[in-house]
């Protein structure tokens, strides 16, 4: 029987500080719980939303119950006995990190059991010899930034100087990343991509996970804004991914929506669809759910929860986006085929109520829906790789090296 898998990954949607959160300075972080608390207390009201957080379709898949198991506390405003149609778990990350790459790789069978390279200094973050080599290889005359920064704030602070000099803006964060911002029209998108590609090759020996192109437009600090033409240059995964097994063993299609292909360095991806906004990501996902052939894996990363609301520490915006997503989830559920497996999960936390602007080390929800899947609690996963192993089981693939299968269908013992 031909099967499909649909993975909807809500980037940064953690559900409570993990057991090792103290090691990351993240004790007390709870992305969902703290958003729900703010909403319940009318602290996230805006022109777009008000009152308690309303996520009926996510609740029906087990989100609230998963959060209860992870944090020992039901999110405020959630039902203790929802009309459950899905099976749910929560997962601890095996990789010793809280970044996008580590979380995504682990769930597809390649946990990061080595240390990424990081730029830890808040100012003068990058080694001079690296900067000199980038300048020599790319012929740029100078650069701005060279610090830890919020991506939206640094273009406000340095965007006008960038337009005067055409020096690219280099910055980083607590993640293993080197980001380059430049004006899409004045500096040129192709020039930015070429610069990022060269920087990626220079930084690869340092095990920097990603170089990210961050194009923006606008004429001054009041109207600078990032565009949808972000591009990630990522190190290739070190182990065979679930995607590759699916292609080799079942001749499957692996459909990337959003930044998925970039995260996996395009390994094992057969079709790619970009989208610039949360609405567009939902639209493209729904289109693929309706039209993708059987024997397909559809994987969407909903990046805006992280980039627009988590890092920006925008509780109300995050809540509004979650409620919008939940309404669109109804459409996905209505268009699933007879033998589709739907999975909702996250890659790390990014609590908008927490100190700083970085990711937070949290448990993630793991929610499954299939017509023959018993609605039940599936336990705590000790690795995100349980997601990939469960998919491998469902698709009839050979086992991955990491993770355990969580699925038990009706009629099975």
What do the PLM-derived regions correspond to, one by one?
Residues 1-413:
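Feature captures the catalytic ectodomains and active-site-proximal regions of enzymes
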């Amino acid at each position: 029987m031909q099967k499909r898998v649909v993975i909807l990954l809500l980037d940064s949607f953690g559900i409570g500080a993990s057991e090792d959160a103290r090691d990351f300075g993240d004790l007390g972080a709870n992305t969902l719980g703290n958003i729900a608390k703010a909403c319940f207390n009318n602290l996230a009201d805006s022109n777009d939303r008000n009152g308690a957080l309303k996520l009926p379709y996510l609740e029906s898949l087990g989100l609230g119950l998963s959060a209860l198991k992870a944090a020992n506390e039901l999110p405020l405003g959630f039902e203790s006995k929802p009309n459950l149609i899905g099976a749910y778990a929560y997962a601890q990350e095996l990789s010793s990190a809280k970044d996008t790459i580590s979380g995504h790789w682990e769930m597809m069978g390649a946990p990061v059991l080595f240390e990424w390279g990081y730029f830890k200094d808040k100012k003068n973050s990058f080694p001079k010899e690296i900067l000199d080599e980038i300048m020599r290889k790319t012929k740029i005359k100078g650069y701005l930034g060279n610090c830890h920064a919020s991506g939206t704030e640094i273009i406000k602070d340095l965007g006008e100087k960038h337009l005067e000099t055409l020096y690219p803006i280099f910055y980083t964060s607590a993640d293993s990343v080197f980001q380059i911002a430049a004006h899409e029209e004045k500096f040129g998108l192709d020039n930015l991509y070429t610069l990022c590609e060269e920087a990626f090759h220079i930084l690869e020996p340092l095990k920097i996970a990603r170089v990210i192109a961050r194009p923006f437009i606008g004429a001054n600090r009041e109207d600078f804004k990032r565009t949808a033409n972000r591009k990630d240059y990522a190190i290739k995964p070190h182990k065979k991914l679930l995607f590759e097994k699916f292609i080799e063993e079942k001749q499957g299609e692996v459909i990337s929506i959003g930044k998925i292909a970039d995260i996996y360095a395009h390994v094992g991806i057969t079709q790619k669809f970009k989208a610039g906004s949360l609405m567009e990501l939902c639209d493209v996902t729904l289109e693929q759910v309706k039209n993708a052939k059987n024997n397909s894996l559809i994987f969407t990363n909903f990046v805006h929860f992280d980039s627009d609301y988590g890092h920006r520490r925008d509780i109300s915006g995050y809540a509004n986006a979650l409620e919008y997503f939940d309404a669109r989830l109804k459409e996905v559920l209505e268009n699933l085929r007879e033998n589709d497996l739907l999975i909702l999960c996250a890659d790390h936390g990014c609590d908008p109520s927490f100190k700083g602007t970085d990711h937070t080390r949290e448990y993630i929800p793991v929610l499954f829906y299939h017509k023959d899947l018993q609605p039940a609690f599936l336990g705590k996963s000790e690795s995100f790789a349980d997601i990939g192993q469960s998919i491998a089981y469902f698709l009839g693939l050979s086992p991955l090296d990491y993770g355990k299968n969580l699925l038990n269908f009706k009629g099975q013992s």
